[in-house]
Structures are given as C-alpha cells and as structure tokens.
C-alpha cells in the first residue's frame, strides 16, 4: 500500500529511475550502496519491463506525503466501491448476492450523503465476501459498524448518523 510510507524517501536515489523516460540502462544510477558490490562502479537501474504497482486508500492519512514530483511518475486508476460487484458471485448464492448488493448500495448512498464523508468512504464488495462464513448481522456488528464508527468519530450526532447507516443497511 503506497501510502503506508513516505514514498519519496522509500525510493530515494531511485526517484528518477522510476520515471519511464529514465528506465533501462540509459537511466542507471550509482547509489550510496555501490560499495557493497564487488564492483563499486556497478550501477542500478529499473528495467523497462518492471512495473511498480501500488494500492492507495484515499482516506487513509497515516502518511500524507506523496509529493507531486513522485505522483506524476505513476498512473492512477480509481476503483469505486460499486465497480467490483461481480466478485459477489463467489458467495455461490444468488439470493444472498442480491441482498448484499442491495444493502451495500443503500448503505453507500447514506455514506455519501453524510456531511464530512464522500464516495471515498463507501464500502466495497470485498467486505461482503465475508458472508460466505457469517450472516448479515455479524457482518454489521463485527466489521461494518466499527469501521463506520471510526469514520464518524468526533462528528456531531454520531449516534444519529450510525442509526441512519444501520437503517440503510437493514433497509
């Protein structure tokens, strides 16, 4: 997960080597660790065929320094909560799948309508895959309720907001 560390510091001297224009031997760099090699003149580069794939949770602000210089070296593909509903077919129960989609959709509408939250806080289908082993009530009490409570911690009328979330979930 790319926002779990300060990405510019993690890449350090390889900062430029990440850029597609500096890939391959043409972009080789000498790092501070060159003396650890048998040949201290040996250089490091990122091959053209190596792809760095990272995930990023927009609402996780544990580390908030993904600077623009580093950001422009990556392609961003947004995945919305409602884009992977087909994974719920893995529940192997069409009725449960339909109910999961209905509950997730209703809950996500309420989340997005809550002041201080937005679509980035919506619940994705992967949470509902837990329904293979638990029921809807346990999914709410053990997973969704604690997560949503954390989202709204410190907001005005937390209790009322949680009641609206639960009502939407239980529709």
Label every PLM stretch briefly.
Residues 1-171:
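C-terminal regulatory/interaction module of P-loop NTP-utilizing enzymes
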């Amino acid at each position: 997960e790319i926002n779990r560390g300060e990405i510019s510091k993690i890449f350090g001297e390889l900062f430029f080597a990440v850029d597609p224009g500096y890939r391959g031997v043409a972009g080789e760099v000498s790092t501070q660790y060159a003396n650890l090699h048998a040949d201290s003149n040996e250089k490091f580069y990122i091959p053209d065929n190596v792809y760095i794939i990272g995930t990023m949770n927009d609402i996780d602000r544990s580390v908030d320094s993904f600077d623009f210089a580093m950001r422009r070296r990556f392609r961003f593909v947004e995945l919305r909560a409602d884009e992977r509903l087909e994974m719920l077919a893995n529940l192997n129960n069409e009725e449960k799948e339909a109910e999961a989609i209905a509950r997730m959709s209703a809950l996500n509408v309420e989340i997005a309508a809550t002041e201080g939250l937005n679509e980035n806080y919506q619940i994705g289908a992967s949470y509902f895959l837990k329904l293979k082993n638990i029921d809807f009530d346990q999914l709410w009490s053990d997973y969704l309720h604690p997560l949503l409570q954390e989202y709204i911690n410190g907001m005005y009328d937390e209790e009322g907001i949680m009641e609206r979330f639960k009502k939407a979930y239980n529709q």
